[in-house]
Amino acid sequence: ANERPPGSCSSSGCRRCCRPGPYHSHLAVLKAEQAAVFKFPLAPLGCSGLGSALLAAGPGMPGPAGASHLPLELQLRGKLEAAGSGEPGSKAKKGRRSRTVFTELQLMGLEKRFEKQKYLSTPDRIDLAESLGLSQLQVKTWYQNRRMKWKKIVLQGGGLESPTKPKGRPKKNSIPSSEQLSEQERAKETEKPPESPGEPSERQQEE
């Protein structure tokens, strides 16, 4: 009567042998934590810093050591991408040249000044640029283009108007030629009173 089949135990004995000890409770906690970790949704490895850090670490390498290389790689990759994207932009900026758009008032001022003066000296160009709110280079470029257009019109129309020279350069008439000098000398000689043939000269009177 005292013999019990294997696997059967009394209530008190079962409580003693089946009661979980501290070791068993620790294992249960670890299993619960592992289950919670695996149930937690992970982002794709290629899209998250954690995944790339895990890939960089690899088996046999600690996580922090592998993750220390991650910022450097990302930094280098970012610099390369920025340099690659910046080169075409810089080339495009160098290739493009902005065209100056003049206002109606500026064009009117330039045209009026061009009618009076086809060539501008440096002081005149500075004054005109400041009065119209333009740079000297813009005024100079506009004048060059306008003169070319004006010369074509003059040549095609057979006009008698000739291009005037700038104020800074000496005009052709301001420098006397050799013929003009000889004419001036002749004019001076004619101003002297002519000697009459009947009157003796000063040398003859002295003799």
From Swiss-Prot:
Its gene is BARX1
Q: Which cysteines form disulfides?
A: none
- What function is annotated for this protein? Transcription factor, which is involved in craniofacial development, in odontogenic region definition, and in stomach organogenesis. Binds to a regulatory module of the NCAM promoter.
Pfam families (UniProt xref): Homeodomain (PF00046)
Checking Gene3D superfamilies in the record gives: Homeodomain-like (1.10.10.60)
Q: Which family does it belong to?
A: Belongs to the BAR homeobox family.
The organs and tissues expressing this protein are described as: Expressed predominantly in the facial primordia, developing stomach, and proximal limbs.
Q: Which domain of life is it from?
A: Eukaryota
Keyword DNA-binding applies: yes
This chain belongs to the protein called Homeobox protein BarH-like 1
Name the DNA-binding stretches. Answer: 95-154
**PROSITE patterns per the UniProt record, alphabetical:** HOMEOBOX_1, HOMEOBOX_2
